[in-house]
Amino acid sequence: MATITTKETRAFNWANPGTLKVGDEIVETLKDGREVVFVVMDDGVIGLKNLLGYHRMNKEWTNEGGWLACDMRRYLNEEVIALLPDALIAAIKPRKFGEEEDKLWLFSEMEVFGEHDWTENDPDRGFQFEYFKDRRNRIKVDEDGDAHWWWERSPNGSSSNSFCHVYSNGDASSYSASYTSGVCFGFYIQSSIYESAEPCAPR
């Protein structure tokens, strides 16, 4: 018997998102007119499907202080968040990092790849998000459609000047913090009903 697979398209409201499942895509228009695609990555986790421009982790070649001290954190939560629609900003649930909170954040090495030696002593590791278990979903393209490497928030545990990143082919690596590279951020949303292939790991 033949089968057919269809993809539903419907209007979307950040305040009342309805039932979502990993892999669902949400097309949104930024305040500067650019169109971006967000994707459901795990229970309560949404992130960019591809890259939103380029930025450095720090002005200098250092990873001292990790995510909490880096320039990328400031850039996302001051400049990038100002581009998001007000309805989306209102729906975002801040995420705690130690004693501080961020609405937007980069993914950690473990959230993308699962267990990895470079960050084994990093307390800010999390667990691998369901979406990234498929290596193809780790490959991100820029506005021209070209695959490019992109930053993670995890400092390289064996280096004082580099952060982890994802190669253009989806593999793991790290690079000096002052280099400009792809930006792919994530966020939590306030409330929704999710469908997931397996239960969400505890945070």
Model features per residue range: what roles?
Residues 2-203:
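Collagenous Gly-X-Y triple-helix signature in extracellular proteins
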